[in-house]
């Protein structure tokens, strides 16, 4: 996103909305062959908590090949949803880094090559779980957010077992186990297979203790502050 902003500044251009920033970055990543959801770009553009549904990749690839960037900036992107959310005031979030990088593209290739019906079933269940998390945000239910995060983790473990993949590495499993000991729920973040895990809990109670326990296990606490989301002046949707 910083590269996009630097290029805009260099050419004296302005992206007036977070959605425009997202679209520019998403088009660049698609041209580079990225297979991820592009959700990280939405978070960079908007900030804060988001409910995100990825755009129709087939449509985006075909349209990007046959239309100008300006044309895509002005169009609605099918399936794309970027909705700012506000977290319950008692929701606590920690992110831990296991010290091992991971590749989203490589993992997606393995899933699509091996999964078939199981992969599609996972996608359907994951969509339902994410929708439940969204509803928990809307009602301010921190405990439901924790519970649904745990559900999503179990979906990942099922698809991991079905495909003999390495989504939850031993280090990530330890991250989760430690989090649960301090009344948090946790799961791998992003592609899995290494990298980071995210933990959510309720209230300030054991947050510091969890951070200390992670660090004792060789898990690096990622310092972060989740700001208020920007309110878009145009809607992202279909």
Which residues are covered by each model-predicted region?
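Stable alpha-helical structural segments in soluble proteins, enriched in small hydrophobic residues
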Residues: 2-11
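Glycine-rich nucleotide-binding loop
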Residues: 192-194
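C-terminal nucleotide
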Residues: 10-16, 23-35, 41-188, 198-238
């Amino acid at each position: 996103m910083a590269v996009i902003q630097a290029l805009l500044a260099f050419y004296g251009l302005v992206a007036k909305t977070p959605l425009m920033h997202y679209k520019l970055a998403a088009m660049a990543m698609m041209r580079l062959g990225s297979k991820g959801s592009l959700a990280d770009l939405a978070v960079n553009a908007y900030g804060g908590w988001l409910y995100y549904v990825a755009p129709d990749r087939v449509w985006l690839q075909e349209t990007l090949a046959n239309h100008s960037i300006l044309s895509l900036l002005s169009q609605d992107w099918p399936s794309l949803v970027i909705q700012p959310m506000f977290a319950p005031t008692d929701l606590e979030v920690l992110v831990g880094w296991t010290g091992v990088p991971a590749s989203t593209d490589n993992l997606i290739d393995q899933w699509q090559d091996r999964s078939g019906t199981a992969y599609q079933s996972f996608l359907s269940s994951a969509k339902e779980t994410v929708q439940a998390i969204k509803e928990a945000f809307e009602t301010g239910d921190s405990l439901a957010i924790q519970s649904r995060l745990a559900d999503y983790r179990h979906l990942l473990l099922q698809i991991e077992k079905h495909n003999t993949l390495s989504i939850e590495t031993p280090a990530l499993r330890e991250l989760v186990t430690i989090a649960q000991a301090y009344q948090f729920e946790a799961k791998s973040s992003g592609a899995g297979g290494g990298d980071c895990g995210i933990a959510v809990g309720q209230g300030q109670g054991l947050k510091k203790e969890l951070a200390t326990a992670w660090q004792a296990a060789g898990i690096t606490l990622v310092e972060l502050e989740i700001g208020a989301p920007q309110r878009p002046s145009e809607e992202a949707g279909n």
